[in-house]
Amino acid sequence: MLFALVLCALTAFAQDNDKILNRQYVDQKKIHFGFSVGTNFQDIHIVNNGFQTEDGETWFADVPQHSPGFCVNVLADLRLAKNFNLRFSPGMYFGNKVVKYINSSAPDEVTDPLRRNQSQNIKSTYIVLSLDLKISANRYHNVRPYFTGGVMGVFDVAKDRTEQLRLANGDAMLTVGMGCDIYLPFFKLCPELKFCFGLKNVLQKNRPDLEDNPEMMRFTQSVDKVTNNMVVLTFYFE
């Protein structure tokens, strides 16, 4: 919804000035550079297995809500053809995910809150390397919509090593997105919405550090698979 409102407002502004074609030759450059700032919503998809502890407890993990993070990238754009560009945009993404653990087998008489539910805050600082193919429509006055598809490597440099669930630092993601080039008098503004889907199971099941701590180990034992997902709203300045 936010992306649609921002895009409509910027497009309307550009069309108000469409009698003058801004930056007419910018798309003919073989290579150009830029940068972006934006926000991201990080998520993880958790596959629970219904593991039961020795005392009969069954814990389930979930991410019930999401909070926005911040991201910044630099951009190198290579023109392949009239409507095709290859874009490389390394950067950093900051965000966090709150995992809730619920003991579904806790009887009503259990009053200790830690026996009923717990939470874990996973803060992430991703170094990202994103490579996308940009497929653009023909320019209409001062706007030009486009779609993107590509891959993104991520490496988390802010891992807490004592958490209930430990996730691998590295991951690879498939990305699809949409956006619009808006040609302004002094630069090209490109709001873009991108969806990122993790390709690997990032859960680290081998936890020798928790062999003597079954109270913590039960959370890892209750989960089979964890994959990263992310929604990113960025504004490119080119």
Placement of each model-derived feature along the sequence:
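Short glycine/proline- and aromatic-enriched beta-strand/turn motifs that initiate or cap beta-hairpins
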Residues: 14-68, 230, 236-238
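Transmembrane beta-strands of outer-membrane beta-barrel pores
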Residues: 39-43, 92-96, 135-137, 151-157, ...
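Repeated loop/turn-to-beta-strand initiation elements of outer-membrane beta-barrel proteins
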Residues: 43-45, 83-86, 141-143, 186-189
